[in-house]
């Protein structure tokens, strides 16, 4: 990796700090605010420079599409007492914010592939046809590197939802696995959209407890 300038190191440090604090990278607007840039475009230029030097990868189609590379990658695994269980997520707040964590489950992240970073309590029956039931604990691997057809945990505007992901150009379609629920269509040019991770397994609470 090429040597970074002082300013680029500052940007990189903010990205790392935000991932550790909130569980996800900052948006361009957040970077600009923290570092005192005049606009999100200035933050974008610094991100492009970091990508050219091999420190990060920029993932298209999401406002938090930043992935650390090489020596800068974090091992953001489970709390020492197990995987955090996320319950109700408040609008506009990071999914791994402390106030969203109900408890910790003593479960090995390596039981899942790729390994799980947290558990999410499923609400509703929109994915029941593939065995994801209301009240289940969904094992989630934090990533924004996704492919069409994967089951994702997505944030649409201020709502967090579990759906099957498809992208067609500037449009994202989130499909339920239950005929009672229609697809959610997102225009990336106008709507706020982020990926929190992909589903890697299910724990049925009645069996686990």
Swiss-Prot record:
GO biological process: DNA repair; DNA replication; negative regulation of DNA-templated transcription; proteolysis; SOS response
Superkingdom of origin: Bacteria
Molecular function in Gene Ontology: DNA binding; serine-type endopeptidase activity
Protein's UniProt keywords contain Transcription: yes
Active site: 126, 163
The protein's Enzyme Commission number: 3.4.21.88
Catalysed reactions, as listed in the record: Hydrolysis of Ala-|-Gly bond in repressor LexA
Pfam families (alphabetical): LexA_DNA_bind (PF01726), Peptidase_S24 (PF00717)
EC class name: hydrolase
Residues carrying the site annotation Cleavage: 91-92
Record bears the keyword Repressor: yes
Alphabetical UniProt keywords: Autocatalytic cleavage, DNA damage, DNA repair, DNA replication, DNA-binding, Hydrolase, Repressor, SOS response, Transcription, Transcription regulation
InterPro entries listed in its UniProt record: LexA (IPR006200), LexA-like (IPR039418), LexA/Signal_pep-like_sf (IPR036286), LexA_DNA-bd_dom (IPR006199), LexA_repressor (IPR050077), Peptidase_S24_LexA (IPR006197), Peptidase_S24_S26A/B/C (IPR015927), WH-like_DNA-bd_sf (IPR036388)
DNA-binding region, residue intervals: 28-48
Transmembrane segments: none
Function statement: Represses a number of genes involved in the response to DNA damage (SOS response), including recA and lexA. In the presence of single-stranded DNA, RecA interacts with LexA causing an autocatalytic cleavage which disrupts the DNA-binding part of LexA, leading to derepression of the SOS regulon and eventually DNA repair.
Alphabetical list of NCBIfam families matching this protein: lexA
Subunit: Homodimer.
Family statement drawn from the similarity comment of this UniProt entry: Belongs to the peptidase S24 family.
Protein name: LexA repressor
Species this protein is from: Psychromonas ingrahamii (strain DSM 17664 / CCUG 51855 / 37)
Upper classification of the organism: Bacteria, Pseudomonadati, Pseudomonadota, Gammaproteobacteria, Alteromonadales
């Amino acid at each position: 990796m090429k040597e970074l300038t002082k300013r680029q190191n500052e940007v990189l440090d903010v990205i790392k700090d935000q991932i550790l604090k909130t569980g996800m990278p900052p948006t361009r607007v957040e970077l600009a605010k923290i570092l005192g840039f005049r606009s999100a475009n200035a933050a974008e230029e610094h991100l492009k420079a970091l990508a050219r030097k091999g420190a990060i990868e920029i993932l298209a189609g999401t406002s938090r599409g930043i992935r650390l590379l090489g020596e800068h990658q974090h091992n953001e695994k489970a709390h020492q007492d197990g995987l955090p269980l996320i319950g109700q997520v408040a609008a506009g707040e990071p999914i791994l914010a402390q106030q969203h964590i109900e408890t910790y489950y003593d479960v090995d992240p390596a039981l899942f592939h790729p390994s799980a970073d947290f558990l999410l309590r499923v609400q509703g029956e929109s994915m029941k046809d593939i065995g994801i039931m209301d009240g289940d604990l969904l094992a989630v691997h934090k990533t924004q590197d996704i492919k069409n057809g994967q089951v994702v945990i997505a944030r649409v505007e201020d709502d967090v939802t579990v759906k099957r992901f498809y992208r067609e150009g500037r449009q994202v379609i989130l499909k339920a696995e239950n005929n009672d629920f229609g697809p959610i269509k997102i225009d990336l040019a106008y709507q706020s959209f982020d990926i929190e991770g992909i589903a890697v397994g299910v724990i049925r609470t009645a069996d686990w407890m």
